Amino acid sequence: MSDVTHFSKVVAATASTLVSGDLSQSHVMRDISRPAFQKRIFSFSKRPSELVRITSSSKDVLLPDEMLVDIPSNENQFSLFQGFQATLPEHSVGSQLLLGDGSKVGEKSAREQLVEGKKSLSHKLDLLEVRKALAANEITEIDARVAHLQSMRQIVFDRVASLEQQEFQLESEVLRIDAELEQMEEEKEEVIQRHDYETRTPEELEDDVVDLKSVSEKLQSASQKTLPRRNLSRRKTQPTLQQYYEPGNKIRQIKAHSDSVTCLDFDIPFGTMVSAGMDLGLKVWDLSRGDLVTDLKGHNASVTCLQVDNNVLATGSADATIRVWNLDQVVSNPDAQDEGDDAYTIHVLDSHVGEISAIHFSDHTLVSGSADKTIRQWDLNTGRCVQTLDVIWANSAQNALYSNDRLRTGFDANAPFIGAVQCRDAALATGTADGIVRLWDLRSGQVQRTLQGHTAAVTCLQFDDVHLATGSRDRSVRIWDLRMGNIFDAFAYDSPITSLDFDNRRIASTNGENTVKIYDRAAEKHWSLGRGEGDPEAPESTVVKTKEGYLVEGGGDGVVGVWAC
């Protein structure tokens, strides 16, 4: 009996502890303290039964305030049961009448039928309202999820941008160290060669026939600045951030010049950009930050054309000179120019006697076109002109060409005589003021093929392995098949084409309007981007360059816009 007594005391103590505080119920405590309950405890081992009979109603069940704190507010005007009813399938009234007793229909008066019909329609209307509210709630939930995903995407997007910025910085440092190591190796070889020559005995000098002039030239060339090596495969990282922008979105805007932008180019997306303007400025920019690196000095007039190829910059100016710059030195030591204007200059090419209107270089060959009606080929290793191509037909047509402002063919006599050039290996393509595109062989200096179709001056061109794209003042862009020599595709805009750039996916061009024209080559679709899309009063776009879905355009107000395309 002592064990049973001990058990009853433990049960009573435990029960009093569990139901104490806010969760206590007075009638349960009264039942436990009654003698009848104690008697049932003693007989529990022989006749198991319910210790406490719950006789309380729902009105007696109370919830403490602590359990009601986190209940959300009911913003829905419909009950849970109404929502359940709205999800049940409907049965048409007509089918119910047909399935029921048809004799009862006639017994009802017309008024009763109308009242029942109204009730049925009202019920359906209520169900539709509930369903509409449920659908609206789903839309709200989806919008909230989309907003949350967008915020998460922005966080990851910023993380990718930060990682790419760190990659660019480390990559630039690696390339700078590689360039210094290569320079040290070259200097070491030069020292060894000088030492070997200076330590030769008089007998060795007498035995060998030495050309003093050639030795002097070698020593002089060794002391000159050399063209840095350009190898794109050296870059271990490639930018990808531009792929995550929607086409047509603005990435950045830079107030680059105080006057119209005449030309620009960049190496890679978010890399290094060089721009020139009518304000005589020639500036180097960090596209990842939008910061000015330095302002290059050297030309005595505005820069009319330029090209950036990895770590080399070539600029052509209205002062009839071409300058070749080392961009590695510009980026690594932007203050070196304070010591002199030639701190970054590799070569100054000054054989032309007229304004430089077009340049292009590939590997160690640079080709330039000038207002002096000549095309010159340069060796970038030595900085010397190795060939001059004279456009003979221009001399005979000069009087007719400039006798009035506009010819019968429709092109403007004020257009550059040589509007565009591009070279690759021994191939050269030129576009001139007569609207003809000529394909040259640099080995022979002869024209191999002419492409005729434009009716005004050719202002820009670019070719790859298969196609050549040309833009003209006749407002058209033509794509030529280099294998067959005929037109592959053509389209026109409302104004003369001023610049053009293309890749396998799209052709971007400017035509004096305030937007950049994009032609999707795969979808054969035209669309536009630029400040003019949202502002009809925006200034015109003067020049465009694009690479891998990353587009940079210069405006007539000196602003450079960076866009995703």
From Swiss-Prot:
The keyword Protease does not apply. SMART domains: WD40. Disulfide bonds: none annotated. Transmembrane segments: none annotated. The keyword Membrane applies. WD repeats lie at residues 256-295, 298-335, 351-390, 401-452, 453-492, 494-529, 534-565. It is found in: Mitochondrion outer membrane. GO terms for biological process: mitochondrial fission; peroxisome fission. Residues 119-224 form a coiled coil. It comes from the Eukaryota. It is a peripheral membrane protein. Keywords: Coiled coil, Membrane, Mitochondrion, Mitochondrion outer membrane, Repeat, WD repeat. GO terms for cellular component: mitochondrial outer membrane; mitochondrion; transferase complex. CDD domains: Mdv1_N, WD40. Involved in mitochondrial fission. Acts as an adapter protein required to form mitochondrial fission complexes. Formation of these complexes is required to promote constriction and fission of the mitochondrial compartment at a late step in mitochondrial division. Belongs to the WD repeat MDV1/CAF4 family. This is Mitochondrial division protein 1. It comes from Yarrowia lipolytica (strain CLIB 122 / E 150) (Yeast). The lineage of its organism: Eukaryota, Fungi, Dikarya, Ascomycota, Saccharomycotina. The gene is MDV1.
